[in-house]
Regions:
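Short, flexible, basic/aromatic active-site loop/helix in glycosyltransferases
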Residues: 160-180
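Short, acidic, metal-binding catalytic loop of nucleotide-sugar glycosyltransferases
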Residues: 49-58
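Conserved donor NDP-sugar-binding/catalytic core segment of glycosyltransferases
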Residues: 126-162
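Short aromatic/hydrophobic "clamp" motif used to bind/position activated sugar donors
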Residues: 114
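Glycine-rich, basic loop-to-helix element that forms the pyrophosphate-binding segment
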Residues: 93-109
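A conserved acidic beta->alpha catalytic loop
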Residues: 65-76
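The conserved acidic donor/metal-binding loop of glycosyltransferases
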Residues: 118-122, 151
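N-proximal low-complexity "stem/linker" segments adjacent to membrane-targeting elements
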Residues: 1-50
Length: 180
């Protein structure tokens, strides 16, 4: 199964969004909430690269860092990426557990929509573009646009070879309540 669009599709999305900012790209801003805790450099860089490499500029990355003193490299790496991308917001916080740390990331958000991502995730290059377009389509049809979700894949060594694919069904509130 193909998990990512063809290269030419991604290039077309990038061309459509070239030179545009989060304000003028026409897509709603999505704040990606991510609590950080002692994140290994490899995973942190892969995650940050996946945000910086999005095909659309409609994202804001909100990072709440509860790493301990032995992992000061987390802050250093994030600050390095902030130099490249003004849409990365960072705050050092006291560790209060994943739920409270995620809420701390939410306090940094200014987007119309919130998305959740773990510190060892990799965002598909078209994730924010696709979500933004889906929101616009729902609005155009006059349908509620308050909740979106996506499929996911789990990887071990290479993002080219998924270990597990989790294809989620169409929206079904009863199913959602049973699983969460």
């Amino acid at each position: 199964a193909r998990y990512l669009p063809a290269k030419k599709v991604l290039e077309a999305q990038r061309a459509e969004m070239a030179g545009k900012t989060a304000v003028d790209c026409g897509l709603p801003t999505i704040s990606v909430l991510t609590p950080l805790y002692n994140t290994p450099e490899k995973y942190l860089r892969e995650f940050l690269d996946s945000f910086v490499g999005q095909t659309a500029p409609n994202g804001q990355l909100c990072l709440a860092d509860a790493s301990d003193a032995a992992h000061g490299d987390v802050e250093r790496i994030v600050k390095e990426y902030q130099q490249k991308n003004q849409q990365i917001v960072y705050k050092k916080i006291e560790n209060k557990g994943i739920a409270a740390n995620t809420n701390a990331a939410a306090q940094l958000a200014t987007g119309e929509y919130l998305a959740l991502a773990d510190h060892d995730d990799i965002l598909a290059p078209h994730a924010l573009y696709t979500m933004g377009k889906a929101i616009l389509q729902l609005r155009q049809r006059g349908e509620p646009d308050g909740f979106l979700y996506s499929d996911e894949a789990l990887f071990t060594k290479s993002i080219r070879r998924p270990m597990v694919a989790h294809f989620k069904p169409d929206y079904a509130p009863d199913y959602l309540l049973c699983c969460n």
